[in-house]
């Protein structure tokens, strides 16, 4: 390998580690910061913080027990303890172990871009001060550096030098991470003006089929799975951008046909599908669908209206002629192994269930969502609506013992025995992840990840920032919302609809007190009146953060739409990493050279999308709209004569080249974790050695 070739490779490799922005207001336990009415009595935090009064008092007692006589050192140690309350504590403690209690201390020697050196200040202020039960003992820290005396109480006795101390506790602040400088983390918000909104979004039509779900093939190829609401899954080849091609799909040869088990009508059907992260090796995939127990003996599950949630099915009014829990929501596992020794090459699968993961009877005939997806953590997330009935009359979304109106998080890799499943009261063949927020809380169901949703319709993880888990939630009367989902978060329904209090006309299931909630309000959304003057026809469809290179003018924006095709929005976080978004409705149009003719809106020259059922994302991070009029893909703005100063026409993908996910920033991201900086340092060290060998 030539030296210049190696340097290019090294640069490209390292650039992977500088793509993602990690900071987000999030606590070290992955929960969202909560609002406190006044400044905490010990730690100087107010507003949204990661400490309540109990935690604040606990930190104060811990500090007092240290018995620090030097005022300067006491002030430093107090600030370090109180970093636990910082709204960005998840990032401050990003290398956290179960015992670690010290945030990453800003250390200017770690980065040429950092001007802070709080780590050195801590050493110089406290090195000769006795600290009982020191936070800085290496046995607690578990990082590099060997203490000279583990039983000592002074830093100078615990650590051999300032260099060793800051090697273990120091770090830098950058676009990707934050470090603790002795003060609450403050975002660089000198410029809070977002980039100019896009002049519009250009689409091309590449398929006529009407699909509800799209999942890119886990092998990273330019293929994707598309499923219809009746329950047929197709494996399709995706054409390169600018190639003039269309979806390569054979309607007569589906990947799998599940229609025999699925009950389909306007509200029911196959609502979601997910492929195991290791599908290319194990062939496992999952479907979420509805069944009718009056027509299929395999449709058996416990009713969600039961005594545990203070609900009596016999007292529910039949809905559209159906009986309570006649219809069930199901997650089932299937395999592609039976049709191919190499699952990544399988072109079809058998519709025979390998395992029933989850079954639950539905009280009414609407608001059951049903999307499933694997998160970056490898667990299966299951989105469930409030069960319907109009205004959630039984308040299921806030009921702690109900799984309705919740997002669930399940482990489908470690399946308990039948006796264990029965003992734990699970709804099927799965286990509970150890870090689920309510695993040890007897008042709430352990499957729950988040509560207070009405009908979450399409959620996604940002492929560049796994802590950004976005869900659109369909509103009742006035507001459609996008929520930034966090561990244990309560999103307000039906105490709130969007940011406003909601007042149900009747509530046989009781009410939840406003004062008992700590709601997390939407980060984006729109009023019904924005898309329909009558205020009635509106229903949000969640999308994705746009991470493709195709349209640089919407890069980094979260794109979502209204079901009725009346609007598409693009939201951008302002300032960066704040969790606050500015969103704007944008126009959409069809490329003049679209491979398939787009549908025109009656009486106009504009594009008619029909119903926007879902969004999709391929392995190149290009975004698709799955509509009743076909499959549309976001393409270069110039193909619609839209102005985008960032578009470089010379950097277009070459038609006919392989669409490899390795060209995508997210492919680099898959291999990055909390200690990515250490990996970079290691790689650089190895690179220097290799350069010496090459020369």
UniProtKB/Swiss-Prot annotation:
GO terms for cellular component: mitochondrion; plasma membrane; side of membrane. GO terms for molecular function: oxidoreductase activity. A lipid is attached at residue 665 (GPI-anchor amidated serine). Glycans are attached at residues 37, 67, 107, 113, 128, 151, 175, 190, 208, 337, 429, 511, 527, 641, 648. Residues 1-23 form the signal peptide. The keyword RNA-binding does not apply. Its main location: membrane. It is found in: Cell membrane. Keywords: Cell membrane, Glycoprotein, GPI-anchor, Lipoprotein, Membrane, Oxidoreductase, PQQ, Signal. Disulfide bonds: none annotated. It is a lipid-anchor; GPI-anchor. Transmembrane segments: none annotated. This is HIPL1 protein.
């Amino acid at each position: 390998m030539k030296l210049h070739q190696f340097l290019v490779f090294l640069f490209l490799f390292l650039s992977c580690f500088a793509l993602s922005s990690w900071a987000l207001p999030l606590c070290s336990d992955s929960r969202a910061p909560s609002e406190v009415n006044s400044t905490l009595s010990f730690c100087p935090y107010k507003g949204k913080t990661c400490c309540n009064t109990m935690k604040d008092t606990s930190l104060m007692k811990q500090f007092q027990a240290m018995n620090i006589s030097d005022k300067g050192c006491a002030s430093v140690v107090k600030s370090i303890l109180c970093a636990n309350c910082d709204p960005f504590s998840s990032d401050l403690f990003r290398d956290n172990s179960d015992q670690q209690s010290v945030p990453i201390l800003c250390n200017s020697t770690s980065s040429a871009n950092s001007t802070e050196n709080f780590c050195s200040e801590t050493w110089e202020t406290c090195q000769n001060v006795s600290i009982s039960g020191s936070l800085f003992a290496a046995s607690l820290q578990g990082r590099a550096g060997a203490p000279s005396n583990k039983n000592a109480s002074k830093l100078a006795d615990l650590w051999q030098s300032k260099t060793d101390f800051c090697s273990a506790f120091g770090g830098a602040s950058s676009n990707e991470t934050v470090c603790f400088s002795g003060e609450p983390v403050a975002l660089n918000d000198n410029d809070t003006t977002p980039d100019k909104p896009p002049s519009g979004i250009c689409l091309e039509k590449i398929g006529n089929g009407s699909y509800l779900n799209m999942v890119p093939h886990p092998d990273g190829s330019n293929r994707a799975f598309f499923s219809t609401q009746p329950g047929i899954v197709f494996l399709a080849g995706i054409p390169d951008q600018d190639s003039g091609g269309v979806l390569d799909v054979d309607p007569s040869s589906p990947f799998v046909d599940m229609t025999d088990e699925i009950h389909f009508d306007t509200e029911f059907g196959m609502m979601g599908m997910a492929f195991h992260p290791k599908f290319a090796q194990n062939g496992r995939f999952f479907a979420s669908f509805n069944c009718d127990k009056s027509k299929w003996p395999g449709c058996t599950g416990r009713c969600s209206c039961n005594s545990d949630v203070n609900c009596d099915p016999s007292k529910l009014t039949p809905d559209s002629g159906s009986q309570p829990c006649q219809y069930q929501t199901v997650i089932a596992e299937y395999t592609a192994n039976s049709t191919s020794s190499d699952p990544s090459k399988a072109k079809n699968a058998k519709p025979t269930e390998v395992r029933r993961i989850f079954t639950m009877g539905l009280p009414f005939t609407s608001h059951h969502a049903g999307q499933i997806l694997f998160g970056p953590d490898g667990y299966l997330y299951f989105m469930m609506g409030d069960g319907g009935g109009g205004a959630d009359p039984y308040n299921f979304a806030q009921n702690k013992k109900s799984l309705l109106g919740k997002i669930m998080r399940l482990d489908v890799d470690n399946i308990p025995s039948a006796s264990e499943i029965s003992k734990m009261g699970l709804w099927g063949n799965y286990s509970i992840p150890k870090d689920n927020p309510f695993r040890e809380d007897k008042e709430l169901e352990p499957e729950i990840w988040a509560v207070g949703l009405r009908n979450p319709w399409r959620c996604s993880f940002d492929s560049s920032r796994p802590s950004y888990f976005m869900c659109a939630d369909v509103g009742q009367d006035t507001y459609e919302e996008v929520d930034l989902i966090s561990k244990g978060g309560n999103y307000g329904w039906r105490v709130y609809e969007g940011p406003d209090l909601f007042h149900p006309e009747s509530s046989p299931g009781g009410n939840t007190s406003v004062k008992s909630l700590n709601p997390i309000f939407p980060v984006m959304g729109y009023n019904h009146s924005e898309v329909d003057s009558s205020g009635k026809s509106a229903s949000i469809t969640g999308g994705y953060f746009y991470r493709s290179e195709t349209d640089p003018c919407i890069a980094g924006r979260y794109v979502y739409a209204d079901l009725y095709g009346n609007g598409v929005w693009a939201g951008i976080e302002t300032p960066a990493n704040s969790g606050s978004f500015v969103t704007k409705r944008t126009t959409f149009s069809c490329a003049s050279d679209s491979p398939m003719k787009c549908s025109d809106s009656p009486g106009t020259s504009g594009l008619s999308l029909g119903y926007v059922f879902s969004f999709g994302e391929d392995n190149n991070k290009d975004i698709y709209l799955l509509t009743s009029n076909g499959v549309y893909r976001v393409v270069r703005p110039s193909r619609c004569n839209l102005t985008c100063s960032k578009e470089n026409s010379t950097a277009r993908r070459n038609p006919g080249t392989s669409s490899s996910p390795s060209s995508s920033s997210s492919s680099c991201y898959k291999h990055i974790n909390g200690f990515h900086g250490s990996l970079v340092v290691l790689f650089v060290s190895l690179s220097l050695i290799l350069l010496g060998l090459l020369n």
